[in-house]
Amino acid sequence: MYRNVTQEIFMEQTKIILDENEMPKRWYNVLSDLPSPIDPPLDPRTWQPINPEALEPIFAKELIRQEMSSDRYIDIPAEILDVYRLWRPSPLFRAHQLEKDLKTPAKIYYKYEGVSPAGSHKTNTSIAQAYYNMKEGTERLTTETGAGQWGSALSLACNYFDLECKVYMVRSSYYQKPYRKSLMTLWGGNVVPSPSPDTEFGRKILKEQPDTPGSLGIAISEAVEDAIAHDNTKYTLGSVLNHVVLHQTVIGAECKKQLEQVEEYPDVVIGCCGGGSNLGGIGLEFIKDRLEGKHNARVVAVEPSACPSLTKGEYRYDFGDTAEMTPLLKMYTLGHKHIPPAIHAGGLRYHGDSPIISKLCAEGLMEAVSYGQKEVFDAAVQFARTEGIVPAPESSHAIRCAIDEALEAKQKGEEKVILFNLSGHGHFDMASYDKYFSGELE
């Protein structure tokens, strides 16, 4: 009997949408559930555990409290929820057309964070960080950005809460993605390529390495130096730190509810990983189930082979920035002086990783894999041509891994359920796609 595959596809649910009143009202803090605590950050002056008060010159007090908190859940303020409602809850899609193209028995689901105004998951934490700084009287925020997703998200958030915003954008991405700068400027952000002549450290790097592509470590140093130099200014970070990962857990909480609607639970959960926030955002809710003995989903971090901190780095204390101004964090690191190649996934060019993600990987609760950018773009193009969404190069790392998991399921004849985070769209990355189509990607 002839099987009409197309008809069967459209009989099944493709997108799973939650009502606004089903949006999570609190963030999940995995620190409360870990078998042992993560190692504390160290003061760069003494190399002893840092006193929280020592962080107050650069961070809002509430964000420091969240960074150190052992509370299992932290309520989301109503003012933040009001802004979240512009795009949350975000949709969960079943990738029917990709499944068909792969001829796999696996079911592939993806959470799409590109529906946020800034086009990525970064807005989940930028809104929170800008809000808490505004409440404490901060007038100006500084930050770094790699590919520009975080800088865009913070510029948007500062616009909402009437704050000035200075963004130090890694030089290679500043010139690769000029329209990201335009978007940040549209929302009131002041964007400069890093290293820049605006800071002492930037001038030092430019003198020593005038042709450097820059790095997130350098950009962080510049943003921290700027914040310390101005009394009305605080620094914000788009990934790595505990409170940033905390704010992203709305992603996984929504995923759980959405999968429950179709009576599914993932066998594997996948996220790209630079600093670790989007991976933590989608993965920690499922790690919680694993720690409680309820389920045993694998959680996989996917990083670029050009910057393989989890797969080839050392698990030790290291500075978060190049100038050694930040606290030292226990994490997987390639070394804070490391300058990665100028790959097109600029948001993943970070030498270290979240202490939370690092600990989970070290203890076998997460896995990590790496891919070269050519095979990542192969997957991105296949996804765009089947599912229609143009993915960001960073997010495409998760797609590559999801496709490989689906092909393995095909080989083994397994009906595996695969979930990945499509953390952002690639509308500002078309020059990178042009490089791919012209055969210029290394």
Swiss-Prot record:
Needed cofactors: pyridoxal 5'-phosphate
GO cellular component, as recorded: cytoplasm
Function recorded in the entry: The beta subunit is responsible for the synthesis of L-tryptophan from indole and L-serine.
Stated family: Belongs to the TrpB family.
In-chain residues carrying the UniProt-annotated modification N6-(pyridoxal phosphate)lysine: 122
Any one Gene Ontology molecular-function term assigned to this protein's record: L-serine hydro-lyase (adding indole, L-tryptophan-forming) activity
Keywords: Amino-acid biosynthesis, Aromatic amino acid biosynthesis, Lyase, Pyridoxal phosphate, Tryptophan biosynthesis
PROSITE patterns in the cross-refs: TRP_SYNTHASE_BETA
EC number(s) on file: 4.2.1.20
Gene3D superfamilies linked to this entry: 3.40.50.1100
Catalytic activity: (1S,2R)-1-C-(indol-3-yl)glycerol 3-phosphate + L-serine = D-glyceraldehyde 3-phosphate + L-tryptophan + H2O
Pfam families named in the record: PALP (PF00291)
Organism: Methanosarcina mazei (strain ATCC BAA-159 / DSM 3647 / Goe1 / Go1 / JCM 11833 / OCM 88) (Methanosarcina frisia)
Assembly behavior: Tetramer of two alpha and two beta chains.
NCBIfam families listed in its UniProt record: PRK12391.1, trpB_rel
Name of the protein: Tryptophan synthase beta chain 2
Pathway terms, separated by semicolons: Amino-acid biosynthesis; L-tryptophan biosynthesis; L-tryptophan from chorismate: step 5/5
